Amino acid sequence: MAIEFGSRKENFDNFKVYETTLAGRPFKVEMGKMCGLSNASALIRYGETCVMCNVVMSPKPREGVDFFPLNVEYEEKLYAAGRIPGSFMRREGRPGERAILTSRVVDRPMRPLFPKEMRNDVCITMTVMSLDPDCSPEIAGMIGASLVTAVSEIPWNGPIGGVQVGLVDGEIVLNPTQEQRKKSDLALTVAATMDKIVMIEAGANEVDEDTMLNAIKAAHVEIKKIITFINGIVAERGKPKIDFQVVGLDMDVFHAIKEKYLDDFKAAMDTDDKNVRDAALLPIMDKIAEEYPDLTEADLDLVSYKMQKYVVRRWLLDEGKRVDGRGINEIRPLAAEVGILPRVHGSGMFTRGQTQVLTTCTLGGTKDNQLMDDLTDEQTKRYIHHYNFPPYSVGEARAPRSPGRREIGHGNLAERALIPVLPDQAEFPYTIRCVSEVLSSNGSTSQASICGSTLALMDAGVPIKAPVAGISCGLITEGDRWMTMLDIQGVEDFHGDMDFKVGGTRKGITAIQMDIKIDGLTYDIIAEAFEKCRKGRLYILDEIIKPVIAEPRHELSRWAPKMFSMMIPTDKIKDVIGKGGKVIQDICATCNCKIDVQEDGHVFVSAVDQEDAKRAIFTIRTIVEDPEIGAIYKGKVTRLMNFGAFVEIAPGKEGLVHISKLDTKRVERVEDVVAVGDAIVVKVTDIDQQGRINLSRRDAILALEAKKAQQEQG
């Protein structure tokens, strides 16, 4: 059977490379060769970082949903960094924390620019295929996601661009290199359109508001250049945007409902109690459902959403009135408490209105550090913050689920807010884990987690450099009109246009996370939000946290492990560990402790009982230090001979106690005084030229008795 081969070869006639620079480094876009079945795709090359970006839209809208089903996935392949996954299957598993956080960072600026009425599934995928540590794959992925969506036929009001900003020696640096990031006081990511800022994410070492705003402005200048580059590609190969099927509520029906029931909604919502408000809305919705039987469950949910949104926004814009009656710059009632849970190492509870978070702090040894298996160069993490949002916190009767993207994002925000004030590892070598349990949620739980973490850390005796507090600022816009309000609650977050979260100390900002539902913010709005959050943060620090616990406790909890550190010569590490780990395992078992020996000779010993840790330190010292003549040791009898007993004073170090030096009185037989396995005190009397150690139990007993007598006399 003959096999015929076609003479035609794929020439990729539509393939083209577009080139520019981003923050001084080459930036290339390859289109027309790969992923031909996506709506649009591009391979982004930033330095030697390569990210494959794709966007796909379903041909038909998804039925039965009242939201736009957008899915943004950032994938890290370990082959990009020349590594094999450490899992049993040696295959990448579920997305790691860094990948989830990057997916959120790309999702948040892109989502507001899609039509809210669209119900077609849209999936944006960014796959890191090669990693250059000096060229951020997150920024390459964000720009690539923006580019492919803008080029595709999918309706979208982009493009956007993104830039990272560092602050090195007081100078603003765009897209800092790996070495610059290590020295930077700022890790800021900004996304923007040509005119407005659409996303801000930051961790900072107490940076002031003016410097932060200048960094955002510097980022925007570079972003405008990349947007101009994207627009040139869109002009050349962009596809016409398709019309989509609008799935939603009949607006004539909605206007009729609004005219009839507006006063009822206003009366129901005029309360500061979320439960009362929700209960008052139920009979109104029952009446509407009875009057309009053709409305589906999704339609009724949309009616409720639109009516509440209309009331909240009109009250704010027309009357300056908030749902709970507060002033625009007024914070809800606050409370703080520490030492709530007796057996945990530290605990703190922070309450803001109907939002309440209980945070615990647990201390562990260096071996409790979290192992990282992603593309980052950081292999372990010593400070961990976890955020849990159980259903009961919002009054829902359902089983709890494992943490999702929201929980991971909120936990990371609180984690970044506290990292700048943690003590150096040399000063405080513990692993620190904070867990924030949301007990009740009515907005700003992530900021309550920051405050709760400060309380728990100080209650645990962690010597933080300064207390940290967090607060959020909201926004309502209508055309050119806008209004910001401090400390937004749930209904204002849900129906407002912005949730601007800022954590920091008295000195400056340590973390920012900005979410918006509109097409962007002006510098004036950002500056006002910064100032309101600064004043609110100082109030919480001075009036709420300081009176409860002004500084970290001077002693750790009695239940916390006690940790000691020491340095040993690197050539002695093998002696401490022993063959197959036998020596170190014996020390851990005997002293009931944990020991971590690092490559540079640092040894960390932790134990709940301080005396156990000290015994382990002493044992390690006896191993690495040569025995001193005149020093007294506690050793174990290993062998009995006619002429004496051999005693191990440290692993691998054995000496002889001659029968004449076994006791203060004459000894006829060695076994009359000691047996194999006995623990006895001995004194080093001599070390000969061959390194053999001579010991005396008699001299040790006499020396200890003399010391005791001296103490009794003195």
Residue locations for each model-derived region?
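Long, basic N-terminal domains or extensions that often function
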Residues: A2-Q245
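Conserved phosphate/anionic-ligand binding catalytic regions in large, soluble enzymes, centered on
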Residues: A40-L43, C135-E153, V338-C361, N442-V462, ...
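Conserved helix-loop functional segments at active or binding sites
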Residues: R108-K116, V151, I340, G365, ...
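Flexible, glycine/charged-enriched surface loops at secondary-structure junctions
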Residues: K116-V122, N157-P159, I226-F244, N275-V276, ...
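Mobile "lid/hinge" segments at catalytic clefts and subdomain interfaces of large enzymes
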Residues: E153-A268, L457-H554
